[in-house]
Amino acid sequence: MNSMPHTESNILQVERNIEQIDIKGQYINLASPIHLSGQINITELFAEYSKNIAQSDTGSALQIGVDEAGRGPLLGSVNVASAILPRAWSGLIEAQLLKDTPLSILTDSKQLSEKKRDLLYPLVQQYAIGYIIADIPAAVIDQINILQATMLGMRLCTEILLEVIAHHLNDMAQDIHQLQTAVLFDGNRCPELNYTSLAQLGIKESMIDCQAWVKGDARHTSIAAASILAKVSRDKTMYALDTEHPEYGIAKHKGYPTRAHMEAIETYGVLSAHRRSFAPVRKALES
């Protein structure tokens, strides 16, 4: 099986809580902190970087897949993840680059059973060169709307991953200016990155190729990997909420507006984790 060496000594853990954010030059105090977590395999990052600068063609660029989970539910966070797979594993799903790897069953998380997603989740974490998972709480969704919350999550997952990469390449006395990165966002639009902040780390806008991939989670392995991280991490928060509020049946509907969920809201009321800006919740509060 084609797998990477992976030891704990190579791993840098990443944890951030974002309470204030710069959006187009304006600082906004978030209604609730955005939590981000992840890790980087420093040894594999350096190996991929060396391959990156040894090849001048665009196909050698470091590829970051980005996807979200949970835009539609009435309850809980929207989760976003970014993931970097080994370059030999990163490409079109139809090319079967993962055929002989531990991630051979990886495809769009929506096409996989929950059992397979749960199986893939730790494997993606283990074999990814790096990943970041963001949890954007309902209060922030209500503050800036679900689209902007999703775009902000995509932006933060990308920027923090690039920031950590830049710091460690600079620490290893590597020329960061030779790094070329393709960021592949699932969907039909890309978030606006804070290029001013990235430039302070040595990452120029010309070094980043942002691409929007419609149905990218079913087309590209790196986006599919991010999809697994986002989906399973959100499911975990739903199961935790279900333990706290079993009467709502959250483990079954995961916060989506099913009949059972709407009946639970009518019977037991609106939870603090409900998205008050969403029409069904807003109507329940008004009634």
Swiss-Prot record:
Gene3D superfamilies referenced in this protein's UniProt entry, alphabetically: Ribonuclease H-like superfamily/Ribonuclease H (3.30.420.10)
One of the protein's GO biological processes: DNA replication, removal of RNA primer
Keyword Cytoplasm in annotation: yes
Note on cofactor: Manganese or magnesium. Binds 1 divalent metal ion per monomer in the absence of substrate. May bind a second metal ion after substrate binding.
Residue numbers binding a divalent metal cation: D67, E68, D186
Cellular compartments annotated: Cytoplasm
Cellular component GO terms, alphabetical: cytoplasm; ribonuclease H2 complex
Gene Ontology terms for molecular function: manganese ion binding; RNA binding; RNA-DNA hybrid ribonuclease activity
Catalytic reaction(s) noted: Endonucleolytic cleavage to 5'-phosphomonoester
EC number annotated for this UniProt entry: 3.1.26.4
Top-level EC class as recorded in UniProt: hydrolase
CDD domains reported for this sequence: RNase_HII_bacteria_HII_like
Cofactor(s) needed for function: Mn(2+); Mg(2+)
Keywords assigned: Cytoplasm, Endonuclease, Hydrolase, Manganese, Metal-binding, Nuclease
Domain RNase H type-2 positions: 61-287
InterPro entries: RNase_HII, RNase_HII/HIII, RNase_HII/HIII_dom, RNaseH-like_sf, RNaseH_sf
Pfam families documented for this protein: RNase_HII (PF01351)
Function in brief: Endonuclease that specifically degrades the RNA of RNA-DNA hybrids.
Family per record: Belongs to the RNase HII family.
The protein, known as: Ribonuclease HII
Species in which this protein is naturally found: Psychrobacter arcticus (strain DSM 17307 / VKM B-2377 / 273-4)
Gene from which the chain derives: rnhB
